[in-house]
A protein has these predicted regions:
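Intracellular alpha-helical coupling/juxtamembrane segments of multi-pass membrane proteins
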Residues: 328-331, 351, 355, 453, ...
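Conserved catalytic alpha/beta cores of large enzymes that bind or transform nucleotide phosphates
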Residues: 171, 176-185, 191, 515-548, ...
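Charged catalytic and DNA/RNA-contacting regions of genome-maintenance
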Residues: 1-337, 353-366, 370-462
Length: 868
């Protein structure tokens, strides 16, 4: 094998220190990859595989493969690799190759991983990108989360047998892109499987040394200060060790200033409502169950934010509903103030529009990857602050007043950027052209030389003619001698002694002077020098801005919160929501409640509102019967979403709501076979029910849909009844429960089970047709309407006829008389339903926006409904 070149030896040494990363090795204007990295990158990035070895006598397999990307376009390629879960180590030239003596010095400047991405093009504007650190031992667990793009950091810890489940639930809040695991965490299959299957999260297995407590305490003290360390529980170091492991990983991979990560949010159980992954999925808080899309989720309805940071703030509220009645009241009070003052609210929203992402801007500035455009964007945002401050100051609400006080106008920072950076800077700070004219005299002088090099020469030529009296003197240029002074032979006796002869021609002599040599050097190097000087000035300006980083972060946080509050207010007004009363009563009372998402998805029909009452003692458990497709699941989800909305401080889709704080919401809705885990529908269902009964408390809200349907009728009914009795029994659980079932026999429990009450979904039948009225009414359903639903689904008529015959035979065998549907059957007073629909439409009608003709058409439509 041929001896390696010095450059390849250097490459292999650096690669040896970064074996788990794809190494981007800087060579001139390209980042090159070699050997296995080249093969992998060429496949993932569709790059042509070549080789530096041009020896025609070597077989292709003996040549080291190579591929590369232009350095100025590398961000897009790095982003593609990181999005696929790879680590990318960026190896940069640490000195100017033109000035290097021998081999150019190179070193890793950062390692980009899924959890450490800060490039704006690689991130979703309204979603955070978290790196998490998890520590786990036989007694305790800790979970730390950090978004490198904004600097926010969160930390929590757990003890006891359920510590792993709690950590997984926290992962559901943050949806990390990458996890750094302690040895104990890496061995916990429940955790690693959740990271892989539920979050598609890259896992970095750390050593015990990375998570050591002494090192963790040192890192926390350095990064967040002594006070932050003192706030952590001394008796449970797991949280500190999780954060220490995360910080260790950041220091190893980032190799830059991380001082903007300066505020630690430590929280314990009891501060936020805890939601497991099943509840988050079934309630479709941030993405739909099937398409994994934002549209159709609760976030889609509530998010009318005007800034990326406001969108992230609102999303975090949805992920972390509050448990403190006081905190909820303060937030909903701010929303109410915004709802009540239409003009000020709309002016605030207009002022926030297009503000930009100050949180991520200051992150990139401190991190060192910001360009001139980032500084210009920050300046533009700062210029909007006085207007936003004035709008916020017009509200008397306590929460909004606090945000106003938190809003630093940053006039000094904005003025400094405005003075230094031009209005439309180029993309790269390495090419110059972004320092404003007049900011620095030396930059101005060099630019003058660049723009008017010939003019400078002409000025010198005129000056020399006047000084020497040589009328034919001229200054010229050629590639051999550079600039020169040419004097005809008739005047060579007048040449000053300071002129140095350089060349003799037939009719003239050519000279140079020290001044001309200096000027030539300035002209030839002006471009390089002005670019270098501009970068120095940019670096100095960046350091000035970094000194104000915490002020900028506080202001950005206030803006994000104001934006999120304004969004909730705008949605409340537009959708006709009410402010809920939130207390610790244990009561859930909702009048004319609506599903926040379904009502926005309906186009041609009105959503039918429903009432809900669940008391601390009475009506704790609602047994809901009715045909499939009638709306049972929608109703139950509706109640859960209204409770959750109330606990994030939002208004809710109802005419009145009183919500006793709920500590957890559990859902068992629908089921699908988990074939990959070898689990059937029924096994999945029973596992989820077991988890719910093990973790629920009397303060929880349970949404249980069709328990027991995955097995035989009597087994299923027995399990359903036992679960229902367990939920209702205050000595065992006593949780508020919405229990939908197709076992009509369970309706008899209303008479024997304390706190149980029957409800059903009203339907109307005409002949063999069925109409769902979507109305929840007291009492149990008298039949299932299964064949009528099958008809709606489009089963062939022959199948339906045969089904009716079989049903009649089965019911006769069991001593049940078959009663075909009457020609017209109402389970409830239809006029009451129609009146409810009309009243709901009237409440939501924006009369000021209606034309006379539109109003008349509405009246005709309402009259038609009431006459049916």
């Amino acid at each position: 094998m041929a001896e390696l070149t010095p450059m390849m030896k250097q490459y292999l040494e650096i690669k040896r220190d970064n074996p788990d990363s794809i190494l981007f090795f800087r060579l001139g204007d390209f980042y090159e990859m070699f050997a296995d990295d080249a093969r992998l990158a060429s496949k993932e990035l569709d790059l042509t595989l070549t080789s530096r070895d041009k020896d025609p006598n070597k077989a292709p397999e003996d040549k080291v493969p190579m591929c590369g990307v232009p350095y100025h376009a590398s961000d897009a390629y790095i982003a593609r690799l990181v999005a696929k879960g790879y680590k990318v180590a960026i190896c940069e030239q640490m000195e100017d190759p033109a000035k290097a003596k021998g081999l150019v010095k190179r070193d890793i400047i950062r390692v980009v991983t899924p959890g450490t991405v800060i490039d704006a093009a690689s991130l979703e504007d309204k979603s955070s990108n978290y790196l998490c650190g998890i520590y786990l031992d036989e007694n305790a667990a800790g979970a730390a989360f950090c978004d490198l793009s904004t600097g926010e950091a969160h930390l929590t810890g757990f003890t006891g047998p359920d510590r792993v489940e709690h950590v997984v639930n926290e992962l559901g809040r943050f949806s990390p892109a990458e996890a750094v695991l302690s040895p104990g965490a890496a061995e916990e299959s429940t955790l690693t499987q959740a990271l892989a299957d539920k979050f598609a999260c890259r896992v970095e297995k750390g050593s015990a040394a990375r998570f050591s407590l002494p090192e963790a305490e040192t890192h926390i003290r350095t990064q967040f200060g002594e006070e932050a360390l003192k706030r952590l529980p001394a008796g449970n170091p797991a949280a500190a060790m999780a954060l220490g492991g995360l910080l260790n990983y950041l220091y190893e991979t980032q190799k830059t200033d991380l001082s903007y990560i300066n505020t630690l949010d430590y929280y314990e159980q009891g501060r936020f409502m805890e939601l497991d992954l099943t509840a988050r999925r079934n309630l479709e808080l941030t993405a739909t169950l099937r398409g994994k899309e934002k549209k159709g989720s609760l976030l889609w309805v509530l998010d009318k934010t005007r800034t990326p940071m406001g969108g992230r703030c609102l999303r975090s509220w949805l992920e972390r509903p509050l448990l403190s009645v006081t905190a909820i009241a303060r937030r909903s009070g701010a929303v109410a103030a915004l709802v009540d003052n239409t003009i000020a609210r709309e002016e605030l929203i207009a002022a926030l529009s297009g503000l930009g992402d100050m949180e991520r801007l200051i992150g990139r500035i401190v991190y060192g990857t910001a360009g001139g455009r980032d500084l210009a964007s920050l300046r533009a945002a700062i210029e909007r602050l006085p207007q936003i401050h004035a709008q916020l100051a017009s509200f008397s609400d306590r929460k909004l007043s606090e945000l106003t006080a938190q809003l630093d106008l940053l006039e000094d920072v904005g003025a400094r950027i405005a003075a230094a950076i031009c209005d439309d800077p180029p993309f790269s700070v390495r090419e110059g052209g972004f320092i404003r004219d007049g900011f620095d005299p030396e930059v101005d002088r060099l630019r003058h030389i660049l723009k008017g090099g010939k003019g400078v020469i002409v000025e010198m030529e005129s000056r020399e003619k006047e000084r020497t009296g040589i009328r034919t003197l001229k200054i010229g240029y050629n590639k051999v001698f550079g600039y020169y002074i040419e004097v005809s032979n008739s005047f060579k006796d007048q040449v000053p002694e300071t002129y140095i002869r350089k060349q003799t021609l037939v009719n003239a002599e050519r000279y140079i002077t020290q001044e001309l040599k200096d000027l030539e050097q300035e002209i030839l190097t002006a471009s390089e020098r002005v670019v270098a000087l501009e970068y120095e000035l940019f670096t100095a300006l960046r350091e000035e801005i970094c000194a104000a980083a915490q002020r900028i972060q506080r202001t950005a946080a206030a803006l994000a919160e104001a934006d999120a509050l304004a969004s909730l207010a705008a949605v409340a007004v537009h959708n006709g929501y009410c402010r809920p009363e939130v207390d610790e009563s244990g009561v859930i009372e909702i009048r004319e409640g609506r599903h926040p998402v379904v009502e926005r998805m309906l186009r041609d029909t009105l959503f039918v509102p429903n009432d809900t009452f669940m008391g601390e003692k009475q009506e704790r458990v609602a047994i809901i019967t009715g045909p499939n497709m009638a709306g049972k699941s929608t109703y139950m989800r509706q109640v859960a979403l209204i409770v959750l909305m109330a606990q994030i401080g939002s208004f809710v889709p109802a005419s009145y709501a009183r919500i006793g704080v709920v500590d957890r919401i559990f859902t068992r809705i629908g089921a699908s076979d988990d074939l990959s885990a070898g689990q059937s529908t029924f096994m999945v269902e029973m596992t989820e029910v077991a988890d719910i009964l093990r973790h629920a408390t009397k303060h929880s809200l349970l949404i249980l849909d069709e328990i027991g349907r995955g097995t035989s009728t009597f087994d299923g009914m027995s399990i359903a009844r036992a679960v229902l009795e367990y939920c209702a029994d205050k000595k065992l659980l006593g949780a508020k429960t919405l229990f939908a079932t197709h076992y009509h026999e369970l309706t008899e429990l209303e008479n024997t089970l304390e706190g149980a009450v029957n409800y059903n979904i009203a339907v109307k039948t005409k002949g063999e047709d069925i109409i769902f009225l979507r109305k929840i009414v007291p009492g149990g359903a008298d039949r299932s309407y299964g064949i009528e639903v099958a008809k709606l689904a489009g089963l062939p008529e022959k199948v339906l006829q045969r089904a009716r015959t079989v049903l009649r035979e089965l019911e006769e065998e069991n001593g049940v008389s078959y009663a075909p549907p009457r020609r017209e059957e109402d389970q409830v007073c239809l006029s009451a339903v129609a009146e409810g629909e009309v009243l709901d439409a009237l409440r939501r009608c924006q009369t000021d926006a209606l034309s006379p003709l539109e109003a008349l058409n509405l009246i005709y439509e309402w009259k038609r409904k009431l006459s049916q």
